[in-house]
Design a protein with these regions (language model features):
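Acidic/His- and Gly-rich active-site-bordering loop/insert found
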Residues: 36, 239, 287-320
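Extracellular/luminal Protease-associated
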Residues: 23, 105-234, 296, 303, ...
Length: 536
């Protein structure tokens, strides 16, 4: 009898899975994307009116689906306390001084940045020293700071990693966390530096100066100041041209120092000039919110555990006008991801036979400011981190015709990889490797913050082979987006978009999530993975 009843349960779950997948609608996702990317929401800025509208829309939509609140005090919200730091570029100054030579830098034209001290006036007067890529890695036996005391100094460096074309150094073209700009600032602070300046080049950053300027030239939402953590007085960037002028004061060029930074025997180079100036900033308290919903599972033992679907709701708000448009709508980044998770929440809530485990649906704030919302949830989870079975994250999906493949960045590092392969087979999808490993996408989206606390987490993305299009269609579309729309006002919704790709991606992730929700064991990181030490 038990076997018979179990067979009925399995059959019901399988039937529910098929029904749920077929009910996922690209046109519903179109409607969500269109609204979230509308000018009415003013670019969904953190702590701004448009951001609050986005939060309320997401919560109200979850409620309309019958998804229960999973935030604080019986609400759909988890408040993330932050401090908004806005640099006054007109009153701030920055110059390089060597003897009687002085090179003044212009805000946004030559340099841009912020302060992590959260003080309104921060004087800067420090010796500059070049530290290559600013990496300290025991596993890679690489230390750009070896033999150098940078306490109280400003370190100058490049983002990315040394020798990216050499597979024997770090992971070759596949960027690791040590190559990310946020790591550079963290390591500089750990070393006691007063400031950190990244010399921007498009090849090392992976995007142009306009992306840096548009992202950094406005309010910077930061986590509330922790006096126990080191804080940079200045953290920022200079253009390649301005960086070249700075380096010329000491007889160096961008090209020669990029080459020097690739040398395994690299040692830091005193640049012989001082950075002098003052950063003038205004501060305000920000109470932005993660939006969280829950659908409970059917098994009394399993419902305390949850599969977590996520996407970030924020974008850049209003900023520097480009062709008389100052609204950074963020249609692809990331109204599309929110649309996928909303549609998955709707269908999951409608299932007659719920899976064993519960499901959480999360919409993070402040991803564009350094994954702040996901970072806060990881530190203050609304359910114990050990009970989060998996995090399936969506970020920046390109609407198009269906693709023949999918990219699931990071899943191969977990015990659910075989389930990913099976779900792809059932969806008639091939699994492709990351087409742009040099971008380090695993470390650039919210799931990374959950991985850091040991939760198996990865991003589900669209593939590169679009049905009915030339083989290079996807790569050309990405190149155009990265050059002309990414973090620009041009990232807007279009009526001619085909949402078949998002529909298929949502069904794939839905199937995968259901299978994990019904699995006997909780997923784990593979033995030896960098995140296995943080959790299961």
């Amino acid at each position: 009898m038990r076997i018979y009843l179990k067979s009925i349960e399995i059959a019901l779950i399988a039937s529910a899975t098929l029904a749920g997948q077929s009910d996922i609608s690209g046109e519903r996702m179109r409607a969500h994307t269109r609204f979230l990317a509308h000018d009415l929401l003013e670019g969904r800025g953190v702590g701004e009116r448009g951001g609050t509208l986005a939060e309320e829309y997401l919560a109200a939509t979850l409620a309309s689906f019958g998804v229960k609140p999973a935030g604080e005090n019986g609400t759909y919200f988890q408040t993330v306390p932050m401090v908004g730091v806005t640099v006054d570029g007109q009153r701030s100054t920055m110059s390089a001084v060597k003897g009687d030579k002085q090179l003044a830098l212009r805000w946004q034209h030559d340099y841009i940045g912020t302060t992590h001290t959260q003080l309104p006036e921060v004087p800067i007067d420090a010796e500059a020293v070049f530290v290559g890529h600013g990496i300290v890695s025991k596993t890679e036996k690489w230390d750009d700071y070896k033999g150098t005391d940078v306490r109280g100094k400003v370190v100058v460096l490049f983002t990315n990693e040394p020798q990216p074309e050499n597979p024997q150094v770090f992971k070759g073209r596949t960027l690791t966390y040590a190559g990310r700009w946020v790591y550079k600032f963290e390591e500089a602070a750990r070393q006691g530096a007063a400031g950190c300046i990244i010399i921007h080049t498009t090849p090392t950053a992976g995007y142009g100066w306009d992306v840096v300027r548009n992202s950094w030239g406005k309010e910077d939402p930061q986590m509330e100041f922790d006096p126990g953590r080191p804080a940079l007085r200045f953290a920022g960037w200079v253009t390649e041209e301005a960086g070249g002028r700075l380096l010329s004061l000491s007889g160096h060029t961008v090209e020669t120092l990029l080459k020097a930074a690739d040398d395994p025997n690299f040692k830091s180079i005193p640049l012989g000039f001082r950075l002098r100036g003052q950063l003038v900033s205004s501060m305000r308290a920000i109470k932005s919110r993660n939006v969280l919903g829950r659908v409970e599972g059917s098994d009394p033992k399993g419902l305390t555990e949850a599969v977590l679907f996520s996407a970030h709701w924020d974008h850049l708000g209003k900023g520097i006008a480009v062709r008389n448009d100052a609204v950074y709508n963020g249609a692809i980044d990331n109204a599309t991801g929110c649309a996928v998770v909303l549609e998955q929440a709707r269908v999951w809530a409608s299932l007659g036979q719920k899976p064993r485990r519960s499901a959480l649906f999360a919409f993070w704030t402040a991803e564009e400011s350094g994954l702040r919302g996901a970072e806060y949830f990881a530190a203050h989870p609304t359910i114990p981190a050990a009970k989060v079975a998996i995090n399936i994250n969506y970020d920046a999906l390109f609407p198009s015709a269906r693709t023949r493949d999918a990219v699931v960045t990071g899943a191969e590092r977990t015990t659910v990889w075989s389930m990913v392969q099976e779900a792809a087979r059932r969806m008639e999808l091939e699994l492709s490797p990351d087409p742009r490993p040099e971008q380090g996408s695993f470390y650039r989206s919210d799931h990374f913050m959950l991985a850091k606390v040991g939760i198996p987490a990865f991003k589900v993305g669209l593939g590169t082979r679009v049905i009915g299009k030339p083989d290079d269609f996807s790569s050309k579309e990405y190149q155009d987006y990265n050059a002309n729309r990414y973090h620009q006002p041009a990232d807007e919704y279009r009526d001619d978009w085909d949402f078949a790709s998002l529909e298929h991606a949502a069904r794939f992730g839905f199937l995968l999530g259901l299978n994990i929700a019904n699995a006997t064991e909780l997923p784990r990181w593979n033995p030896g993975d960098e995140f296995a030490v943080a959790g299961r």
